[in-house]
Design a protein with these regions (language model features):
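N-terminal "domain-start" segment that seeds a small globular fold
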Residues: 4-37
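Rossmann-like NAD(H)/NADP(H) cofactor-binding core
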Residues: 47, 78-82, 107
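Non-globular targeting/processing and membrane-anchoring segments
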Residues: 1-2, 6-7, 163-165
């Protein structure tokens, strides 16, 4: 049984030191382009850890898509989905994103990135069915959202304060 969708504004826990994983290279599965989190400095970044086998991740991806549509696809909101299942590869991730119509950045998290997420924030970031997400604000501060599925409205409530700053 899937956990209920969170309808309350998610609580946010912030960290201010720039994490090392922001400098680690990722490869966008859809474009084959290399990027780092630091490439998005000055923008608001919504990061989700996921896996292609995870049904909650499909739901969460659909809600991220609705979020972008509701906000008019702003240039200063970037979404990144990091596949933390080391058994999955770039080709299968590309197929997954295409199949579901997800058009933001998808990357297989290298082991060092996955370890950093688990060590810095919590091992739950390596458990995709918990729908772990975080927001990186314009100043590079990391804000962790509560675990559990979040609908587009809840995500909008979480990101809008950072978009208006």
């Amino acid at each position: 049984m899937n956990p209920p969708v969170s309808t309350a504004a998610p609580s946010v826990t912030a960290t201010t030191a720039t994490p090392e994983w922001f400098d680690m290279e990722l490869v966008d599965a859809q474009t084959d382009e290399t990027f780092t989190m630091n490439d998005f400095a000055g923008k608001v970044v919504l990061v989700e850890t996921m896996a292609i086998w995870c049904p909650n991740c499909i739901f969460q991806g659909s809600e991220v898509r609705k979020l972008h549509e509701a906000l008019g696809n702003p240039d200063d909101l970037i979404s990144v989905s990091l596949d933390v299942d080391y058994n999955e590869d770039q080709a299968s991730l590309k197929e997954y994103a295409s199949e579901w119509g997800f058009d933001w950045h998808f990357a297989v998290a290298p082991l060092l990135v996955a370890r950093a997420l688990g060590n810095l924030y919590s091992a739950e970031y390596l458990n995709p069915p918990l729908s772990p997400m975080l927001i990186i604000d314009r100043d590079g501060n990391v804000h962790q959202l509560e675990y559990g599925k979040k609908d587009a409205e809840t995500l909008q409530e979480a990101v809008e304060p950072f978009l208006t700053k």
